[in-house]
Amino acid sequence: AFEGDNGLYGDLRSGHVPSFSFIVPNQCNDQHGRGNGGATCNFDPSSNGTQAGLNPALIYRGDVTLQRLVQAIWASPAWKVGDNAIVVWWDENDYSLAPNVNKVLLIVYTNYGKHGIQSPILYNHFSLLRTLEGVFGLPCLNHACDSNVEVMSDLFSR
């Protein structure tokens, strides 16, 4: 849970957070704009001004949720101690045509490295897995150590 003294924001305020956190937003806050049918999280099946049934308010809500979360992490005492990183990675591609198909946006914020880096390396989802496995000294899962999977060292360097 994000809210309350026992939730994520409480942990961030206290500075007591785990070494690794994997945060996945719910359907109301995931920027897909589809929602779950709840009273405050509606999917709009009509085409009257919406983007093919997407609810623009839910896309905005996801943007605000992400902004609030990143700001809370930056304000946390935990962010100021040691080497920390925030990785924001979307799971949808940009629908680009060949030869640049299936590009997804990845943003890495660190409290220690260079800022404004734009990597020329084409990474995939296994690249993040391989990078994390290396950081934590874990064995490779699935295809994370295939020869075509790059470690994201340029995005986490000093």
Regions found by a protein language model. Give the residues of each.
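N-terminal pro-sequences and low-complexity stem/linker regions of secreted or lumenal proteins
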Residues: A1-R158
